[in-house]
Curated annotation (Swiss-Prot):
GO CC annotations, alphabetized: cytoplasm
SUPFAM superfamilies: Peptidyl-tRNA hydrolase-like (SSF53178)
Lineage: Bacteria, Bacillati, Bacillota, Bacilli, Lactobacillales
Site residues, Stabilizes the basic form of H active site to accept a proton: 93
The protein's name in its UniProt record: Peptidyl-tRNA hydrolase
Originating gene: pth
Catalysed transformations (reactions): an N-acyl-L-alpha-aminoacyl-tRNA + H2O = an N-acyl-L-amino acid + a tRNA + H(+)
Length: 188
């Protein structure tokens, strides 16, 4: 069985440390721990790394389409590698959770997250795993766009980093046992 873990974010130095790039940050850490490097796959508008974990093929994917068009990269990769959407996990930022809180879900709506909305639209299914990493709500007077495209202030940086570590620990646990429900039970 082949699995794919996608980290959502925006490409480019300008966005590298923004809240919206929590998925990219978590996937970068996971790739580092698995000792794999990303290579650009231009036809798929993505950075892709691949390896084997417990004898199963694993693809790590960072779409280069910008957040709101992530599905345009993810759907063709699933089709090309013949991966079922149930074996897809998407890591992303979550406005509705406090900074650093990690929540795992097996299916559901986008919850207003435009990258997830794009994946649902292009994949044609809501039945894929999600790892939501909390970034909190905007402070009074700040727009959602400005909030997600800003970095973490000093008091939240460490908490956000802890969330990234927890998300990666959850993914390593999932890759070891292959059971997302069991992973949810342990990490939610």
């Amino acid at each position: 069985m082949t699995k794919m873990i996608v980290g959502l974010g925006n490409p480019g130095d300008k966005y590298e440390k923004t809240k919206h790039n929590m998925g990219f940050m978590a996937l970068d850490l996971l790739a580092n721990e698995l000792n794999v490097d990303f290579k650009e796959e231009k036809p798929f508008m993505s950075l892709v790394a691949s390896t084997f974990v417990n004898g199963e093929k694993l693809f790590l994917v960072k779409p280069l389409t910008f957040m709101n068009e992530s599905g345009r990269a993810v759907a063709p990769l699933l089709k090309y590698y013949n991966i079922d959407e149930a074996d897809l996990t998407v890591m992303h930022d979550d406005l509705d959770s406090p900074v650093g809180r990690v929540r795992l879900r097996q299916k559901g709506s986008s919850g207003g997250q435009n990258g997830i909305k794009s994946v649902i639209t292009h994949v044609g299914s809501q039945t894929f795993n999600r790892v939501k990493i909390g970034i909190g709500r905007p402070k009074h007077g700040m727009t959602v766009v400005n909030h997600v495209l800003s970095g973490f202030d000093n008091e939240d940086k460490e908490i956000a980093q802890d969330g990234i570590f927890k998300a990666v620990d959850a993914m390593k646990f999932y890759l070891e046992n292959g059971d997302f429900q069991k992973t949810m039970n342990k990490f939610n």
